[in-house]
Amino acid sequence: EPSTADDDADADEYWYYLKSSGKVANGKQSNVKGQGFVFGNKDDNFGQMLTNWVGGTKDGDSYKYEEIGGEDSVAQLSDYASNGVVYYCMYDEDKADGHIQKNKWRKTWRPEDAYEEDEDEDKYWYWLEKDGKAYIPDSDDMKATGYAYDLGDGALEVDGSQFSFAKKKINSKDYFFNADGEMLSDFVNVVHTEDANVIDLGMYYFGGSSDGSMKTGSQTVKDDNGDSFKFYFGTKDNNTTGEAKGKGVTGNKNNKLYYMGHLVAAQDYKYQPVFMDVAGNGEEATFIVNQNGSIQHSALEYKEDGDILIDAKTNKVEFKTKNSSSKVWDKYSVEKGSLIINVEDIDEKDVMPISTDVIASGSVTSGSKPQ
């Protein structure tokens, strides 16, 4: 049987399955000793048991199957998205017999890297459906484009160029996948969407590479140095407030100030001012925050070691007692009067430096097993 180790097997030898009639099986076979297998049905692979990444190209009412990848292969899983199917038939002489993997996560190499098999960090997570088909998004699934980010040395850093991706719910959790069916992780900034009801513009977080599920609510994330940073992402979709599930909050949330999900807090002084475009219309609201990111809203002198950092008393500054609208979260920003500021303000783009050409704003335009 295929699961039996054979150290003397020649590289050009293949496994075949003979039906009760004595004929060699070919194509997808759903019940070979209770498991599904895929056998070649092309002239150059007829009857050969196909393993690892297997692609089927539509041919009339059936498919023509072949192994994807190899040392000289340039094939991508996305090549089969619109007119084919992809299976993962895990084969290991000691552990797996080559049957179709179903209804599970599988961490493995891309087809073009399958023969290297030397770096675990080059593996990606894929989702295999109940029928065994690997989830490879087609053009109808690809609802958004954006950029991947890593939290490097205290700042989010762009990882690669703009790309397209799809959103999929698996076991009640939301995931993003790229065109080759690779699960995304870390941060993704959505800058273009075809349907804001499916994926809204903004920053999202999916945990580390061993997780990948969309995060909501308060999150603490460590950068490459092990330093912790706080974020807040929407917990549900709410058309009234503009909150979107998983999307990083900008503005006042629970009296803390956030920019695209990142907590904005005083760093160099006990208190610092922040000028932030909360509404996304180019107009900046003025806030005062402390070192915990809590928004201050009293008309007094904000001091440190006897020095006045920010004076909201002299000009009798008034602060907003509620948001300007249901979708503009600027409560406790300055409404009347002007602050006397004796310290540097916090530039949220320094805290979270995202180049302006990839900041999502405005309206819609046309490890271990994942948890």
What are these regions (language model features)?
Residues 1-371:
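Extracellular adhesion/carbohydrate-binding repeat motifs centered on closely spaced tryptophans
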